[in-house]
UniProtKB/Swiss-Prot annotation:
Keywords: 4Fe-4S, ADP-ribosylation, ATP-binding, Iron, Iron-sulfur, Metal-binding, Nitrogen fixation, Nucleotide-binding, Oxidoreductase. Its EC number is 1.18.6.1. Belongs to the NifH/BchL/ChlL family. It comes from the Bacteria. It is an enzyme of class 1 (oxidoreductase). The gene is nifH. This is Nitrogenase iron protein. Homodimer. It comes from Tolumonas auensis (strain DSM 9187 / NBRC 110442 / TA 4). CDD domains: NifH.
Length: 295
């Protein structure tokens, strides 16, 4: 099959790295050849695949030897569970320089050194937070990733981030082949969450490709620095990630999204009862003040 390059975006803390690594593990279990590139200075995009605290990053190693040109591919590329190839871009120390530059430098280095081998089926870019500008947009801005998956939940800020990321995709879709491939709902167990994300996906012109239920086994596996697929391959949650992997493999719905306004997003939340119908009299009032007013 032709190489498919996918970028995973979403609100910070939504579970992008965990979801990506479990998805990648499921793909590897299916026999797919996969490379995962962490595009986050935290360098936590490959730890579950490698059973490691954090992989040494390309930028760290480049600083140690002098420059990225002094590195060899085998220095930065590690092989983890299921033969998954792992690399972390890294970035400068906090408060110094532009971390986005690390993403650009790392991806260019991997390309030049032949990391994108012919036998690869998938490359996944696990990207910092919901940043879709500058260096962190490099996987979509430079047409590296054609498929964008957004990890979200039924929480307002996660949906807000998904909408913002969609705006970024629209911008870069005009000059390249990048497309939104779907929303992955990583459940936070909010009310009517699956219905809400399906409705949001519909407004964005895309699909909720899968609803990943919340299960504490994910955290138990993480404590052991393992994916659920490897830690307990017979559990229900492992099958959820396998289902997601199958849906990604067979996905054909790649769209230029249609972002909504903030008012439209709030209307959607009101429709599903997540946000109260707008009432100017409650703005800025504490719970105690509201209780006193209704007593």
């Amino acid at each position: 099959m032709a190489l498919r390059q996918c970028a995973i975006y979403g609100k910070g803390g939504i579970g992008k790295s965990t979801t990506t690594q479990n998805l990648v593990s499921a793909l590897a279990e299916m026999g797919k050849k996969v490379m995962i590139i962490g595009c986050d200075p935290k360098a936590d995009s490959t730890r579950l695949i490698l059973h490691a605290k954090a992989q040494n990053t390309i930028m760290e190693m480049a600083a140690e030897v002098g420059s990225v040109e002094d590195l060899e591919l085998e220095d930065v590329l590690q092989i983890g569970y299921g033969g998954v190839r792992c690399a972390e871009s890294g970035g400068p120390e906090p408060g110094v320089g532009c971390a986005g530059r690390g993403v650009i430098t790392a991806i260019n280095f991997l390309e030049e050194e032949g990391a994108y081998e012919e036998d690869l089926d998938f490359v996944f870019y696990d990207v910092l937070g919901d940043v879709v500008c500058g260096g962190f947009a490099m996987p979509i801005r430079e047409n590296k990733a054609q498929e964008i998956y957004i990890v979200c939940s039924g929480e307002m800020m996660a949906m807000y981030a998904a909408n913002n990321i969609s705006k970024g995709i629209v911008k870069y879709a005009k000059s390249g082949s990048v497309r939104l491939a779907g929303l992955i709902c990583n459940s936070r167990q909010t009310d009517r969450e699956d219905e809400l994300i399906i409705a949001l996906a519909d407004k964005l012109g895309t699909q909720m490709i899968h609803f990943v239920p919340r299960d504490n086994i994910v955290q138990r596996a993480e404590i052991r620095r393992m994916t659920v697929i490897e830690y307990d391959p017979t559990c229900k949650q492992a099958n959820e990630y396998r289902t997601l992997a199958n849906k990604v493999v067979n996905n054909k719905l790649f769209v230029v999204p249609t972002p909504v306004t903030m008012d439209e997003l709030e209307e959607l939340l009101m429709e599903f009862g997540i946000m109260d119908v707008e009432d100017e009299t409650i703005i800025g009032k504490t719970a105690a003040e509201e209780a006193a007013a209704t007593a």
